[in-house]
């Protein structure tokens, strides 16, 4: 009996991808909801409490640097009559330094409150979406109700149209996980840099650092608002397995989710967390 090697190879490929995608699809949703919908809990853990409030924490370091700026200002003010250079009025400068020092001392609290406001807005939009679609707006719901979640079975055919759509869906989820994990880490880094971003406001020549920090931080946070609207649209689609257009529209919406940070970056500025974009930049370093 002659063995059909072509069919054996196809069956092996189908089995490998079926096992890979099913294992990822069943465990990925909890990570996505955690990394996408960020709230104040990201700031209020033990690590950030030590980083901001310890005896040699970020707030102490930033305030020490602020004191250095104050000494420099006093020296510059003293030398102003001899150099003829413009110096900010002492009352204005000291008032600004006092406000900045207070903000630096409460930088963890300010970040926590800002994220709490975003979390409240997120919950309001989720409730609005649930009223429209009748479904909880989350990636958990997306995976539990999707017909494109691949199960570990012999029915999966990677080379069929349905298999291609399911593969795009699974690859999209993998891309989402890496992109939003990068975003999650970047937000943590920006929170750690917040005291020094506030410090840059002490002079007009360095104030652009804070503006750049805030634009980047806000654009990364605003991504989750954009994602909610995309998920609402996704859950409102009536997917019919016999309608190719509705299926392609569904997969296209998943693609939009993977590019959400790029769209917000074009709108508000900031940095990209797109996995393909960062891999391309990394490869360009070695050219």
Which residues does each PLM region occupy?
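Binding/recognition "hotspot" determinant
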Residues: 1-65
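Alpha-helical transmembrane segments and their helix-start/interface "positive-inside/aromatic belt" motifs
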Residues: 2-17, 89-105, 210-211, 217, ...
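Non-cytosolic segments of integral membrane proteins
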Residues: 9, 13, 20, 24, ...
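Hydrophobic transmembrane alpha-helix segments characteristic of membrane transport
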Residues: 65-101, 193-207
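Alpha-helical transmembrane segments
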Residues: 198-215, 236-239, 266-267, 271
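Transmembrane helix-bundle signature of multi-pass membrane transporters/permeases
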Residues: 213-221, 252-255
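Cytosolic juxtamembrane regulatory segments of multi-pass membrane proteins
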Residues: 280-287
């Amino acid at each position: 009996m002659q063995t059909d090697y072509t069919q054996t190879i196809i069956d092996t490929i189908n089995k490998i991808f079926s096992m890979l995608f099913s294992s990822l699809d069943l465990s990925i949703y909890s990570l996505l909801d955690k990394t996408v919908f960020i709230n104040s809990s990201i700031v209020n853990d033990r690590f950030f409490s030590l980083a901001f409030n310890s005896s040699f924490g970020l707030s102490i370091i930033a305030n020490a640097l602020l004191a250095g700026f104050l000494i420099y200002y006093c020296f510059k003010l003293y030398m102003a009559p001899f150099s003829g250079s413009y110096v900010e009025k002492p009352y204005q400068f000291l008032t600004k330094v006092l406000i900045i020092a207070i903000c630096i001392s409460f930088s963890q609290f300010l970040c926590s409150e800002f994220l709490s406001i975003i979390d409240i807005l997120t919950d309001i939009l989720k409730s609005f979406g649930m009223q429209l679609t009748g479904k909880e707006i989350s990636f958990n719901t997306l995976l539990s109700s999707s017909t494109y979640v691949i199960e570990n079975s012999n029915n999966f055919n990677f080379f069929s149209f349905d298999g291609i759509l399911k593969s795009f869906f699974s690859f999209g989820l993998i891309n989402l996980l890496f992109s939003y994990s990068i975003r999650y880490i970047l937000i943590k880094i920006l929170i750690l840099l917040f005291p020094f971003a506030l410090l840059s406001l002490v002079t007009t020549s360095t104030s652009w650092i804070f503006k750049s920090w805030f634009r980047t931080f806000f654009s990364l946070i605003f991504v989750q608002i954009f994602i909610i609207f995309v998920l609402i649209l996704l859950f409102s689609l009536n997917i019919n397995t016999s309608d190719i257009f509705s299926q392609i529209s569904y997969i296209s919406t998943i693609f939009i989710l993977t590019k959400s940070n790029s769209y917000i970056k074009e709108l508000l500025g900031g940095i990209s967390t797109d996995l393909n974009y960062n891999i391309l930049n990394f490869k360009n370093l070695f050219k």
